[in-house]
Amino acid sequence: MPLPPILYEDSTMVAFDKPSGLLVAPDRWDKTRENLMGQVHAAMGRTVANIHRLDADTSGVLLCAKSKPALDFLSGQFQSKHVRKIYHALVVVLPVEQAMKVVAPIRTEEGSLPDAFTVDLALGADEANPGRMRVFRRRGGKACLTEFRTLERFTAPDGRRYAWVECRPLTGRTHQLRVHLAAAGAPILGDRFYGVPEVQLRLSDLKRGYKGRADERPLLDRLALHASELEVTHPESRIAHRMVAPLPHEFEVALKYLRKFGAGSGFVGRRPPRR
């Protein structure tokens, strides 16, 4: 298979726009599954190594190093949390009575997500569900912190609420954004592990009087999480370097119809301060 689009490349590093559904590295149990690093090694040689990972279902910026010195320098930034990562997610805002059953529901008095909020909950492996993570309220797990900003809010004709959210993980745990949003009562649309599988955003859910066909597909038939931006210090210039992955077409379509048919209230504010 051809390589995903290259967002940036020089002699020290290369950034790809990873599509949803593609593993970053070989699967532990099924070595035959297609993965990005297998494609990269076949096309660019085995000296290229990924600095970090994205979930298979998450799209967006994936950075690789082209040499051992670059790998060590960039990996050190991730380990010391000196990178800036921005994700975007379309979330299902659970009704208040349903949200109260989750770990740490976050709501305004009107029952919507606040303009900005922070989730500070430790995460660890969910032994009852292999391959998944869970929140640890008191003991156990590893410290985990995420800042969120609500960019837009939407209400479908049936009353179901959605929100377009900017996510800034300040730690880098497995499934961090997915678990933190679910814990806040706003699981990511299309999340088969931590979400609400019965909620599938279709045009017929938004457009009054429109009756879709029996085989109508969701507007966004995937995990609605995209790694939009990654900023690191360049291995050679030592200057901050930002890489941006454009929003996938299916996100643009879903947002277009939500803005057109969903009663919403946008929010434009300053980004949280850099750290």
Task: Locate predicted features.
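RNA pseudouridine synthases
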Residues: 1-275
